[in-house]
Amino acid sequence: MLKSFGYSYIDSINIDTTPLQLDQNSIEDVANAIKNCYLCDFSKSRKAPLTGSGSSSAKVMIVDHTVSLTQDSSGNYFAGKSGEMLQAMVENVLHLDTKNDIFFTHAIKCKPSPHAKGFEVEWNSCKSYLFKQIDLLKPKIVIALGKEAYAKLSGDKEENFQNIRGSIIKLNSYTLVAIHHPSYLLKNPQEKRVAFGDLQRIEALL
């Protein structure tokens, strides 16, 4: 039915996360494992890893790519102009509470080191944590903030982001929807209307 309202669907994608499974049995256990993780160089420059914020019973999970300098220094997931915009998007368009209705985390849990590129080594260290969080939370919808977060979640590095942005993608046991990152919208305010439409589609799925 949703197709008749302009919704775009993409065929299901299966990501094999079996080799990545951890022994942790709760979101809190995963958070403790992240806090004690020193598998890559990013752990050396971080103030503290950001393990995830929000409700462990949330049906909506938001995944950013990496921890920003502002987030790392403040410990606040919604710090800075980008964070403030994301909070407004969640509260004013999705009509969700950032503490009780969502779980916000990052694909890469620590602030990148200066001049770091690619993040493949760091992603290989972090991806087990992210997929374990998804496995434990069992969200209905996962929102990827930007191209990089989408690529980490889907394993698709080549897809033109404009082609999949806003599409409803069946990914294993949940629905994945990629939207523009708030930092992109701050630089390209003309795209806010597009992001608003994407968020309205997500709200209709809840």
Where are these regions (language model features)?
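A polyanion-binding, active-site-adjacent surface
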Residues: 1-206
